[in-house]
A protein has these predicted regions:
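Histidine (H) residue identity feature
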Residues: 27, 74, 120-121
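Bacterial N-terminal signal peptides
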Residues: 6-15
Length: 133
């Protein structure tokens, strides 16, 4: 009986989890920019090679500083302070977008652009520049 109950709970949990709420990982066709969208929390992209210089690392950042940008539920895009790295997923072809929850990211030859569709805040990230709005 316990195993039947456990199976029922697992199946119910899987049925309740919709693809729209799951995190989705993807990267630019060049693989220089790697991103994740967590539907209710944030869109974040990390970059491997860049020609721009980030602002000075704040004393409040204990992790790696400005290896990418992110936009959350509120406020404009910001530089990342993290202890992990985004990796995995499939290439998002140039000219295509991916959406999860309130976030949309668009892959362009000029870089990746991610926006919170409700607040219209976000960021643009490329080898040449990092822009927050």
């Amino acid at each position: 009986m316990r195993s039947l109950l456990a199976v029922t709970v697992v199946v119910a949990a899987l049925a309740a989890a919709s693809p729209a709420s799951a995190a989705v990982f993807f990267h630019s066709p060049s693989n220089n920019i790697r991103c994740v969208i967590q539907a209710t929390q944030l869109a974040r992209c990390d970059i491997t090679e860049r020609d721009w210089t980030p602002p000075p690392k704040p004393a409040s950042c204990p992790g790696d500083w400005a290896n990418g940008l992110q936009v959350g539920r509120h406020g404009r895009g910001r530089f990342t302070c993290v202890t992990d790295a985004v990796d995995g997923g499939k290439a998002l072809p140039y000219g295509e977008s991916i959406e999860r929850g309130r976030f949309r990211c668009t892959s362009r030859r000029a870089g990746m652009r991610c926006v919170n569709k409700r607040t219209h805040h976000g960021f643009g990230l490329s080898r040449q520049r990092a822009r927050r709005f």
